[in-house]
Amino acid sequence: EVRFEDYSHEAETGDGTRHPEFAIAQWAAANLTAEERDRAVVYTSAEHCPMCAAGHAWVGLGRIVFATSSAQILAWRTEWEVGAMPVAVHPINHIAPHLTVAGPVPELAQRVRALLRRSAGLAS
């Protein structure tokens, strides 16, 4: 059962903290019990950044499944020459070592890559 869905609101708001992964953590804290949060599985197209990984851990959300890693995204951004990430890239478990994490999912990498190219204003 899907309980919450969101997307990045950074481009439309100019607010670099408007990540969907952080919104998931905020929604879960307000709407789920601690037990429900612990049992929840969060699916994302990209690995959580440090801010989102911390939020996920602080509210006690369960397993994370991500399609592409932060390292993959950093490599693509470097290839496209669209600028560095505003924070250092770290795997989720470097920020929140007790979270259960699965990813990346290689068969989804090219779809996510195309999505990120478009969001960077580049042709697919």
Please name every model-derived segment.
Residues H9-W27:
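A short, polar/charged loop-to-alpha-helix boundary motif
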Residues A29-L32:
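Glycine-/acidic-rich phosphate or pyrophosphate-binding loops and their flanking alpha/beta elements
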Residues A34-A46:
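Immediate flanking context of iron-sulfur cluster ligation sites
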Residues E1-E10, S69:
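Short beta->alpha transition motifs characteristic of CBS
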